[in-house]
Every structure is written in C-alpha cells, then in structure tokens.
C-alpha cells in the first residue's frame, strides 16, 4: 500500500503561509526521512535536520534531491545531545514536526 502524504498540498501551503523561510537558518528536530524538509529547504539559507533514528537519517540523506545538496545537512542526534554538542550554533527558525 502506498501512502501519499499531503496530496493536496495543505500542509505545505499552511507552512509557507505561517513562516518566511527565505534565507533563514533552520533547525528541524525530528526530521524522520525528510518528508517535510524538501518542502521548504529550497528557500532556506541552510537546514540542519536532526533525528535520533539512524535508519531515517540514512533514508533522508539518500533521498536528498541534488538541487538541495549543500543546503541541507543531517545529523543522527536527539535535541538534547545536539544542543550539548553545538551550543554556539544559532538558528532563525526551529521546526518540530511530528516529533512531540
């Protein structure tokens, strides 16, 4: 069975109506396989997407469109470990989609 997420674009249009991603540094917590990442990364200056599941991060990296390479980086990490390892990092926007 194939699952199509957001087939009508409601999630994507709502996200873009609420947030201006243009030239912003984004932290996406709980990125999973990157299903949301691709929907806004083309407008952001850079996206750091983290998830504690190694398999999901591997899938997200493997499926990263060529046009977004260099604009998106992935890390296998919890938010707590990420914050401890990089306390100096600054972001304009943090997204917690499907992660709470």
Label each PLM-derived region with a short phrase.
Residues 23, 91-92:
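Local beta-strand N-terminus motif with an aromatic residue
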């Amino acid at each position: 069975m194939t699952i199509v997420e957001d087939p009508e674009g409601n999630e994507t249009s709502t996200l873009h109506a609420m947030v201006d991603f243009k030239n912003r540094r984004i932290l996406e917590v709980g990125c999973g396989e990157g299903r949301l990442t691709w929907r806004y990364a083309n407008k952001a200056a850079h996206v750091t997407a983290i998830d504690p599941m190694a398999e999901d991060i591997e899938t997200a990296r493997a499926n990263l469109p060529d046009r977004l390479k260099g604009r998106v980086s992935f890390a296998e990490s919890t938010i707590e470990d990420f914050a401890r390892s990089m306390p100096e990092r600054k972001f304009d926007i943090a997204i917690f989609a499907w992660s709470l």
